[in-house]
């Protein structure tokens, strides 16, 4: 599964979505506290988003990667929104005065957007992987 971009993308986006869901979406929907510590899930999510960006950018314009360019672009967009959202939320988490400000609105919007984009990217990559439309790693 990790020998193709689609396989790696499926796993990375699924992990990114689960982290956002456990520490941001479920607490809002269920009205409870975060199921993971915010600082831990924020730092891990930032690292996963950076891994997604590096993976999406690596050999993105090679001729053999032409079928996956749309997925790579969407992956990069999902990673950028996750980075912006988590940086805003980590700032808000460490600064109580920032709650309710523009940064709160930006962080909430971008984390919600990244959750939707991550689940879409994971689904698209998984369907491409299952259909056999993969771009194998060439050394």
Where in the sequence are the language-model features?
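Interfacial non-cytosolic loop connecting adjacent transmembrane helices
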Residues: 31-40, 66-67, 85-111
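Cytosolic juxtamembrane helix at the C-terminal end of the final transmembrane segment
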Residues: 57-66, 120-139
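Loop-to-transmembrane helix junctions at the membrane interface
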Residues: 52-84, 90
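Hydrophobic alpha-helical transmembrane segments and adjacent interfacial helices
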Residues: 21-27, 81-92
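Transmembrane alpha-helix entry/boundary detector in multi-pass membrane proteins
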Residues: 8-12, 27-49, 71-74, 106-111
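Juxtamembrane/interfacial segments around transmembrane helices
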Residues: 1, 64-74, 93-101, 127-133
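Hydrophobic cores of alpha-helical transmembrane segments in multi-pass inner/ER membrane proteins
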Residues: 47-52, 113-124
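Cytosolic juxtamembrane helix and N-cap/initiation of the first transmembrane helix
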Residues: 1-22, 26, 132, 136
């Amino acid at each position: 599964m990790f020998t193709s971009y689609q396989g790696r993308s499926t796993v990375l986006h699924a992990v990114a979505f689960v982290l956002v869901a456990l520490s941001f979406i479920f607490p809002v929907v269920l009205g409870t506290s975060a199921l993971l510590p915010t600082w831990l899930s924020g730092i891990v999510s930032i690292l996963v988003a950076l891994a997604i960006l590096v993976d999406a950018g690596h050999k993105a314009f090679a001729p053999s990667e032409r079928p996956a360019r749309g997925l790579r672009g969407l992956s990069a967009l999902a990673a950028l929104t996750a980075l912006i959202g988590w940086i805003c939320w980590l700032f808000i988490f460490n600064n109580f005065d920032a709650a309710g400000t523009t940064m709160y609105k930006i962080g909430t919007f971008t984390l919600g957007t990244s959750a939707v984009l991550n689940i879409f990217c994971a689904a698209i990559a998984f369907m491409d992987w299952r259909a056999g439309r993969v771009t194998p790693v060439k050394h």
